[in-house]
Amino acid sequence: EIGVRLVGSEMCIRDSCNTAGIERFPGAQFDMVRLGIGLYGVSPIDNSIIHNVSTLKTTILQIRDVPAEDTVGYSRKGHLERPSRIAAIPIGYADGLNRHLGRGNAYCLVNGKKAPYVGNICMDVCMIDVTDIDCREGDQAIIFGDDLPITVLSDKLDTIPYEVLTSISTRVKRVYYQD
């Protein structure tokens, strides 16, 4: 009978907390809670109770030196103001990387450092600026994960983490771990 109360002649379960409520109001959890986005390791209030459970990462395919004043990507939208090292990574809008993140609006992490997206996000690939990052072809690029929360992307897109997560295409390989 845990979680069940008799109200009049009917039984009811009391539940008033979503993920944020679980974190903020432990005394108001009553009979059960609705973890929601917390199942994906996302905390709406940036608390240390919930830990990240997902990472989206890829590897650097190619790195090229590009002179200042040159352009990168479709429609020449990536205009370089300085000589740059530009890396291509195999993820694009067909994989769920939103095109609005391109043109310097967001970044991924390469060896723990911010690598801004350069030019438009293409269908299968995008370019990142690794000029100030010690890296090589084959190194990882973290789109979101422990050190780059998915909320950084959702905030840049003026949306919610659910939309970012559900936009990841089925063509992206999933690897599941169990402790």
Give names to the regions the model predicted:
Residues 19-28:
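Catalytic cores of alpha/beta
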Residues 20, 38, 94:
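Catalytic metal-binding/acid-base residues of hydrolase active sites
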Residues 35-46:
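Glycine-rich phosphate-binding active-site loops on the catalytic face of alpha/beta enzymes
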Residues 50-59:
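Short coil-to-beta-strand transition motifs
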Residues 65-179:
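C-terminal accessory subdomain/extension
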